[in-house]
From Swiss-Prot:
Name this protein carries in UniProt: Probable inorganic carbon transporter subunit DabA
GN (gene name): dabA
The organism of origin for this protein: Staphylococcus aureus (strain JH9)
Residues the entry annotates as binding Zn(2+): 424, 426, 606, 621
Transmembrane segments: none
GO molecular function: zinc ion binding
Entry cofactors: Zn(2+)
Function: Part of an energy-coupled inorganic carbon pump.
Organism placement in taxonomy: Bacteria, Bacillati, Bacillota, Bacilli, Bacillales
């Protein structure tokens, strides 16, 4: 029992290095470093470079591209370098420092000739002898890397590659989502026991190795303990050793981690995986591990050689000149080169990039308010740099935005406003909202796309239930979609007919004899389909939709809003009346919509349409767990239209006029159209007028939004018909980039719409409505930070990781991806499960960057004390800021910006 507790504790702690990965069909953005945020971004970057040779700073090409495009101000970087040098004093000649800085800041690599120079070896040996004890302690973490990493096989590759191939084979077999005709025997017992049963007959192992497998314990914890003991790993090093194995295939390990969270019977899945992996490593390594030295001297020597070579190259100091100094002077030089290494400068370039964006964002807001002030002929806008030394990046805005609490203009909707449309905070909504507001008397609002409803949806046209809320929160309720019994029976029969056709096709494909006949039967049809889809993608897609509407038309449905008893459900079905009131009130507060209602209020979720795209879920709503958010929008709109709910809201101080009607729609981000999901049968005269006005304006809005969006896609030539071109992108089965998704996301603004209204934020900003004056206890802000802002940060860091380290955190080229086991994609037929974004999602071309890899900038419109209170109440968020996993800026009641560094 003691062994089991110890091993389970080790694995529980080691899981911090990977992240749970959902299947690609419900792809949800994940922060790959969420479990590591107790350390600073810089420390994690150093650790990953040491243990996996993964660099998570933007490389030289990305930095140069940012400078060329005006996204990175070199003067900001130079000032950061100057400030850093002022903080340190080095007792070496200044001209060496100047030369070193001028060269290393270009991020050019040290030529191999410098590393191989004999004098470099002499200096390294000299320093190693003097610092052996200290350096051995510094490099202790190298000792506990997997043994298979240190042993090279006959083909010249680490044995860990053979271990990986074995684990890919077995993990694919276990995790298969019922795509294969035969499932893994005994998988219902556990992954480990199924492997034990099958591996005894696997002739990729030798006869002696299979005998070892037969004698393994039935307990995976005991197996892990046995292998670690065999390799003479000290107990204090267990976690580091296990972490090395989890990081070897973080995709497959992450998928198993996800499944262990979803199913109680698979809660020890990572333990099974590690037991199998360690056994495979032991079988392949054998006694060779004894030749792997635990002495750190060779690695310390290599570190000294690299540092000496860097010093000589960047400072233009010949190595023989360095040798003319005594050992203490040489140590001073080495200390300088070590503390001013290339990764320090990569970090400074990244910070300068982020500071440049922060400055540009403030300038946009400043210019927007100057324009508004001039147009309205109101009091002069005083824009001046803040001379407070403690706030070096502040700017003062005294305009219509910097008003006192008694000014009611910010709390009242304009008398001519016909409709208020609440969009998801998704960055793709920002341009669409801007064009809607410019098209007529419409007001837009930002809120997370799940609309504050912690639900699991059970839709009639979806095979599986889906958790329609942020992935870090478990659902608390189940909402079922249903229709009249007759309509449902007809629809189910149609579904079964379609399913039978696909199942028959699959059955023929997966069986020996029928598969020989299948090409003859299906070849002509599939060939014709391929030709038509290639030549006329938009028309073929439209025809397919018409056929689907005719033969598989979804009936008019209702939702189980009221609480129902269902003994088969593990979650409450529907809401009580008080819960409906509470969720409606919470959502309206999060939208900052508790008064001055327009006649027509639209709750707009969003969805994306693309064809032949395994990563389609990555373009859906991140706040709904990688699915469209129209379901949540419809549910909340129906709740808000209920008389008993409105009466309950009235008792809470929120009065919705009888003439105000709530409706639901979906913003299709790939075509910038608004599709109605739910419109009540009866509309008031004012609501009907608003509904018609919005529909009339939508064609122009779509054309303008599509033109703006398509101009950013690497299309060929000028787009003359943006709406048709957008539809072609969404319909073309060969299109690798139907839309940019959330690429270039950079900031999250929490504040009143007046702060950013009319300002072109280039589709880079998440926008969430918030009025600190109505949030007396700070709970609303804490909710926004803990939910929507966290989702945005995860999205931001996934795009960041997929850009700076695509080989490790991305998913490669779409054209060479292989969908495997129904859960994800690989490159080829035996790679790690590629769990990030594809190359085409972040790059405009092979050598042309599109996404800007900078950490999310959160902007809060509130006084300093509100932000300070947030830090006190939300230690998790405070840690993210202090450890540099995101940046924070606020704008207070005087209109003064402050960077919280």
């Amino acid at each position: 029992m003691t062994t089991q507790l110890n091993i389970n504790s080790v694995i529980e702690n080691a899981k911090r290095v990977i992240t749970p990965l959902s299947p690609i069909s419900i792809f949800a953005a994940r922060n790959p470093w969420e479990g590591l945020e107790a350390d600073t971004f810089e420390d994690v970057a150093k650790w990953l470079r040491d243990v996996r040779d993964v660099d998570i700073f933007p490389n030289k090409a990305l930095i140069e591209s940012a400078v060329a495009r005006g996204e990175l101000d070199e003067s900001v970087f130079n000032q950061l370098v100057t400030d850093m040098l002022l903080e340190h004093h080095y007792n070496i000649p200044q001209h060496y420092i100047n030369l070193y800085i001028d060269n290393i800041k270009t991020l050019k690599d040290v030529p191999a000739s410098y590393m191989n120079h004999s004098n470099v070896d002499v200096v390294a040996d000299l320093l190693l002898e003097k610092s052996k004890r200290d350096m051995a302690e510094s490099y202790h973490h190298y000792d506990v890397r997997p043994m298979s990493d240190a042993i090279i096989d006959e083909q010249g590759e680490p044995l860990s590659e053979q271990v990986n191939r074995q684990m890919i084979k077995w993990t694919k077999l276990y995790i298969d989502q019922f795509l294969s005709s035969w499932t893994m025997p005994k998988r219902e017992q556990s992954f480990y026991h199924a492997w034990l049963h099958l591996a005894q007959h696997d002739h990729s192992f030798t006869k002696a190795q299979r005998q070892v497998i037969k004698g393994l314990p039935n307990d995976p914890e005991m197996t892990i303990e046995s292998v670690l003991t065999y390799f003479s790993i000290d107990q204090e090093d267990y976690q580091a050793y296990v972490e090395g194995h989890l990081l070897a295939l973080p995709g497959w390990a992450g998928m198993l981690y996800y499944r262990s969270q979803q199913h109680h019977f698979e809660q020890h899945l990572l333990t099974d995986y590690l037991a199998i992996r360690l056994v495979v490593e032991q079988l392949l390594v054998g006694d060779e591990f004894k030749s792997v030295t635990k002495d750190c001297e060779s690695r310390s020597e290599n570190w000294f050689k690299q540092t000496v070579a860097s010093l000589c190259y960047y400072s233009d100091m010949p190595s023989d000149v360095l040798l003319q100094h005594d050992v203490n002077e040489i140590q001073t030089f080495i200390h300088f080169a070590a503390t001013m290494n290339k990764n320090v400068f990569k970090n400074l370039w990244l910070i300068a990039w982020e500071m440049t964006y922060e400055s540009q964002l403030k300038q946009k807001i400043k210019a927007g308010h100057e324009s508004v002030a001039g147009a309205l002929d109101v009091n002069q806008v005083n824009v001046s740099e803040n001379d407070n030394a403690n706030q070096p990046h502040s700017v003062l805005l005294n305009d219509t935005q910097a008003v006192d609490e008694n000014n009611s203009e910010l709390n009242q909707v304009g008398t001519s406003t016909k409709a208020q449309i609440a969009f998801c905070i998704d960055v793709r909504s920002e341009p669409f909202r801007r064009h809607i507001e410019a098209a007529g008397p419409f007001e837009t609002i930002g809120i997370a796309g799940f609309f504050g409803l912690p639900i699991q949806k059970d839709a009639v046209d979806e095979q599986f239930k889906h958790d329609s809320l942020p992935v870090m929160v478990p659902p608390a309720y189940r909402i079922k979609e249903f229709a009249d019994r007759y309509d449902m029976n007809v629809y189910r029969q149609q579904q079964q007919t379609m399913s039978s056709m696909f199942y028959t096709f699959k059955l023929m494909k997966n069986n020996v004899m029928p598969s020989l006949l299948l090409p003859e039967l299906s070849g002509p049809f599939l060939s014709l389909s391929t030709i038509v889809n290639s030549i006329m993608p938009r028309k073929s897609r439209a025809s397919l939709q018409k056929i689907k509407q005719k033969w598989l038309k979804k009936p008019e449905t209702k939702l189980t809003i009221d609480r129902e008893f269902d003994r088969t459900s593990d979650l409450p079905v529907g809401f009580t009346e008080q819960e409906q009131i509470d969720f409606a009130l919470q959502a309206l507060k999060l939208m900052d919509l508790t008064e001055a209602f327009a006649p027509f209020v639209v709750l707009a979720g969003h969805a994306s349409h693309s064809h032949n795209n395994p990563h389609h879920a990555s373009l859906e709503c991140g706040a709904c767990g990688g699915a469209s958010s129209g379901f949540n929008a419809k549910l909340l709109a129906m709740i808000c239209n209920r008389p008993n709910v409105r009466q309950g809201l009235k008792q809470s101080g929120v009065y919705i006029p009888e003439t105000t009607v709530f409706a639901a729609a979906e913003h299709h981000t790939s075509t910038d159209t608004l599709a109605w999901v739910y419109v009540p049968d009866t509309l008031s005269a004012l609501a009907l007028d608003a509904y018609e006005s919005l529909n009339d304006a939508m064609p122009m809005i779509s054309e303008q939004a599509n033109r703006e969006r398509l101009d950013k896609l690497p299309t060929i030539g000028r787009v003359n018909h943006p709406v048709e071109e957008a539809q072609r992108f969404a319909s073309d089965w060969s299109e690798v980039r139907p839309e940019w998704g959330l690429a270039k996301n950079a900031s999250f603004i929490i504040g009143r719409r007046q702060l950013t209204k009319g300002i072109d934020l280039e589709g880079r900003t998440f926008l969430h409505n918030y009025d600190w004056r109505k949030d007396k206890d700070g709970k609303l802000l804490n909710t926004i930070i803990s939910g929507p802002a966290l989702v945005a940060q995860w999205i931001n860091l996934q795009y960041y990781a997929s850009t700076v380290a695509p080989h490790f955190y991305g998913s490669g080229n779409k054209a060479t991806q292989t969908v495997t086991s129904g859960v994800g994609v690989m490159q080829g037929n035996a790679s790690d499960l590629m769990y990030g974004l594809s190359w085409q999602s972040v790059m405009a071309a092979d050598r042309t960057m599109y996404h800007s890899p900078i950490r999310l900038l959160v902007v809060i419109q509130a006084p300093d004390y509100v932000v300070a209170r947030l830090f006190a109440n939300n230690e998790h968020f405070a840690r993210k800021v202090s450890n540099h996993w995101l940046r924070l800026m606020s704008v207070n009641e005087e209109g003064r910006f402050k960077s919280w560094i």
